[in-house]
Every structure is written in structure tokens, then in C-alpha cells.
């Protein structure tokens, strides 16, 4: 209970500061709408269905890119953690790609995959792949050697060692990797939708900026923040 109360203290203070600034008119209402005006706009977007429509599309993109990274990163992390020879082949290219920010590769991704959904999924995939891969790899690699010796003494096959010993030992690291990957998926979604999209929360923010609707921009930003905080 105490942790929960501490968690809402800072957001409450920020909203209070926002209210005071808007009440004192330090900035014009055009530049910084009040919390009440923003809440009214959010209600209108919910009633019209526009907010749900854009949110659903954004959720689908995050889910698609995240699931693709899980399908690729988990087995690749397990293989690299178990096999030094396999790791020696994969590690140089993975180490190179790891230091390339996904948003920096957006022009090349758009050139290769166009501006449809494929490019957005690739951006989210690249952002969420390495946290899960590296945590899976370190979890498998860090398995207690004594447990592996026990498996060998019981004549476990390589598959049995991975399934019965290494995977259970790596589960905490994999869980952390999944959480980090999901957070990075949301961060990458913001860049992907702001640059090349005709729908989604990022598109709604960009369209509102062009239409001079800072209240809608704030609703979209708060929605991004709340979704990321939930993860």
C-alpha cells in the first residue's frame, strides 16, 4: 500500500503543477491547455470512438513487433547460450546491429519495406529484440555448472538439459527481458508512428499538431505515458 501511494505522489504533483501553471496563465491556453480542458477533449475522443480506433491499431503494432522478437530472440538466445560455436558465428553481426539505434535506421527501413505496416513492425522488432536476446543468453550462460554436471551424470540429452535445467534456471532473466522488450516496443512505436503512419496514437498526435490542437497532442502523450507505465 505504501509503495502504491508513493507511486502516485509524483504524477499527482505534476498534475497539480500543470493546474497551477494554467490557472496563473504563465503560458497561453493555446500552448498549454488546462487539465480540465484536456480531460474534456479526452472524453470527446472516447465518445467519438477515434481514441479507441487509434489505440487499437497501436496495440496491434506493438503486439506484432513484440511477438516477432519473442519468436526470434528466445531460441537464438538459447542457442547462443548453449553453443559456443554457434555463438561465434552469430555474435559479430549481432554485436554490430545492437549498437545501431532502430530510429536511426528508419530511412533505410522505409526504403526496404515501404511505409506500410511492415516497416513499423521491423522498427518495433529491432527495438525489442536485443533486451530479450541478451537476457535469455545471459540466463542460459549463467546456469549453475553443478546442475549441468548432474544432468550429464544422469545421461540427459542436450534437449533434456536445456528443457529441464537451463530454461528453468534462466526464467528470471527471461522474464526481465520480456518486460524490457515490451517497454522498448512502446518507445519504438512512438518514433515509427510519428514518422510514417496514417493511423495510430502517433499519427493522431502529429495530425493534431498540424491542426493546432495541443489538447489532443496532450491526450496522445498522456496515453503513451500511461501505457508505458503499465508495462
Give the location of each predicted region.
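Short cytoplasmic-facing helical segments at TM-TM junctions of multi-pass membrane proteins
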Residues: 135, 139-177
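Glycine-rich helix-loop "coupling/hinge" segments at transmembrane-helix boundaries
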Residues: 111, 140, 187-219, 223
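Loop-to-helix entry region at the N-terminal start of transmembrane alpha-helices
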Residues: 53-61, 111-132, 170, 175, ...
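Conserved small/polar residues in nucleotide/adenosyl-binding loops
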Residues: 224-231
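Cytoplasmic-entry segments and transmembrane alpha-helices of multi-pass inner-membrane transporters
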Residues: 74-110, 124, 134-138, 143, ...
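Hydrophobic alpha-helical transmembrane segments of multipass integral membrane proteins
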Residues: 9, 13-17, 52, 56-80, ...
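Periplasmic/extracellular loop-to-transmembrane helix junction in inner-membrane transport proteins
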Residues: 1, 24-67
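Transmembrane alpha-helices
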Residues: 122, 126, 159-190, 218
Amino acid at each position: 500500500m505504501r509503495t502504491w501511494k508513493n507511486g502516485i505522489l509524483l504524477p499527482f504533483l505534476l498534475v497539480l503543477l500543470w493546474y497551477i501553471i494554467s490557472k496563473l496563465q504563465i503560458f497561453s491556453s493555446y500552448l498549454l491547455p488546462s487539465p480540465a480542458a484536456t480531460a474534456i477533449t479526452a472524453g470527446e475522443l472516447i465518445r467519438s470512438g477515434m481514441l479507441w480506433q487509434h489505440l487499437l491499431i497501436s496495440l496491434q503494432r506493438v503486439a506484432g513487433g513484440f511477438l516477432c522478437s519473442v519468436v526470434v530472440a528466445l531460441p537464438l538466445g538459447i542457442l547462443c547460450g548453449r553453443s559456443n560455436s554457434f555463438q561465434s558465428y552469430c555474435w559479430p553481426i549481432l554485436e554490430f546491429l545492437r549498437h545501431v539505434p532502430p530510429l536511426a535506421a528508419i530511412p533505410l527501413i522505409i526504403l526496404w519495406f515501404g511505409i506500410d505496416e511492415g516497416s513499423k513492425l521491423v522498427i518495433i522488432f529491432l527495438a525489442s529484440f536485443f533486451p530479450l536476446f541478451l537476457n535469455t543468453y545471459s540466463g542460459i550462460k549463467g546456469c549453475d555448472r553443478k546442475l549441468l554436471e548432474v544432468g550429464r551424470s544422469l545421461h540427459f540429452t542436450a534437449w533434456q538439459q536445456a528443457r529441464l535445467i537451463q530454461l528453468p534456471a534462466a526464467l528470471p532473466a527471461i522474464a526481465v527481458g520480456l518486460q524490457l522488450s515490451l517497454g522498448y516496443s512502446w518507445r519504438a512505436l512512438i518514433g515509427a508512428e510519428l514518422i510514417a503512419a496514417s493511423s495510430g496514437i502517433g499519427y493522431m498526435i502529429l495530425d493534431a499538431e498540424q491542426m493546432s490542437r495541443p489538447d489532443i497532442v496532450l491526450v496522445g502523450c498522456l496515453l503513451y505515458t500511461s501505457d508505458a507505465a503499465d508495462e
